[in-house]
A protein has these predicted regions:
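Juxtadomain coupling helices with adjacent low-complexity linkers
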Residues: 66, 70-75, 108-113, 158-191
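Short, small/polar residue-rich loop motifs at catalytic or cofactor-binding pockets
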Residues: 13-14, 78-81, 142-144
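Intrinsically disordered, low-complexity terminal regulatory regions
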Residues: 17-94
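A generic structural motif
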Residues: 33, 99, 163-164
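Short hydrophobic/glycine-rich mini-motifs in sensory/regulatory modules
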Residues: 52, 150-160
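Structured interaction and signal-relay segments at domain junctions
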Residues: 73-137
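A short beta-strand signature within small-molecule sensing/ligand-binding domains used
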Residues: 133, 139-151
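Single conserved hydrophobic/aromatic residue that forms the stacking wall/gate
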Residues: 1-13
Length: 191
C-alpha cells in the first residue's frame, strides 16, 4: 500500500517498511520505479546523508561529462552549422546551435529512447519523411538528423544528435560521421 501526498509542487511517496534480504538487496516498488523512469539495469548512486538517511539517486554516466559535452557540442555545432545535442538516458544535458535553448534539460522522446535501446546510430531526413522528435513535444523541423548512440560497457549511456537546418547542403553523411565521432569520444571519456 503506497501513500501519496503533495508537498508544494512535488509528490512525496511513503511506502511500508522494506527489509534487506540476505544479499543486501532492497526492493524498490514498481510504482516508484515507473514514476522515476528507473528501468531494469539502470545505474543508481547510493550514499548516506548527515542524518544517516540512505539516499538512492539515478546515476547518469554521460551527465558526469556535462561540461566536456557542452564544449564538444559547441565545437561540433560551430564546425557543422548544425544544432548539436548530447543526451544521457533521460534528458538533453548539453546543446549548441539553432534553438538549442529549447532542448537543454528536456525529457527525451520515446522515439529517441527506442533508438538508444537498439544501440544503433541512425540518419533521418525530411525528404524521406523519417525525422523523429528529439524531445517530447518537439516538432522536428530540421532537414536531417544524425543520431549516434554512446555505448559504454555494452550498454547505451546516451546519444549525440545533430540536426541540420541547411536544406541546400547535403551534410547528412558528414553529420552522421561527426555524430559517431562525438559518441566515440564521449564513450572513451567514460573510461
Amino acid at each position: 500500500e503506497i501513500h501519496e501526498r503533495l508537498v508544494g509542487s512535488e509528490m512525496c511517496i511513503r511506502d511500508r517498511t522494506r527489509r534487506v534480504d540476505s544479499l543486501g538487496r532492497i526492493v524498490i516498488p514498481k510504482e516508484l520505479r515507473r514514476m522515476l523512469h528507473i528501468k531494469e539495469g539502470s545505474p543508481l548512486e547510493i550514499y548516506m546523508d548527515a542524518d544517516e538517511t540512505i539516499v538512492l539517486k539515478k546515476y547518469s554516466q554521460v551527465g558526469s561529462l556535462k561540461n566536456i559535452s557542452q564544449a564538444y557540442a559547441q565545437s561540433l555545432s560551430k564546425v557543422t552549422g548544425a544544432m548539436v545535442c548530447v543526451a544521457d538516458r533521460d534528458e538533453i544535458i548539453a546543446a549548441a546551435g539553432k534553438n538549442h535553448k529549447n532542448y537543454i534539460g528536456k525529457a527525451l522522446s520515446k522515439e529517441l529512447e527506442n533508438i538508444m535501446d537498439k544501440r544503433k546510430s541512425a540518419l533521418y531526413s525530411k525528404k524521406d519523411d523519417t525525422l523523429i522528435p528529439v524531445v517530447k513535444d518537439d516538432k522536428a523541423d530540421c532537414e536531417a538528423q544524425a543520431i549516434a548512440v554512446i555505448v559504454h560497457d555494452g550498454d547505451s549511456a546516451g546519444a549525440v544528435i545533430l540536426c541540420v537546418y541547411d536544406e541546400k547542403a547535403d551534410k547528412s553523411e558528414i553529420a552522421e560521421k561527426l555524430a559517431g565521432a562525438a559518441a566515440e569520444f564521449l564513450a572513451d571519456q567514460l573510461g
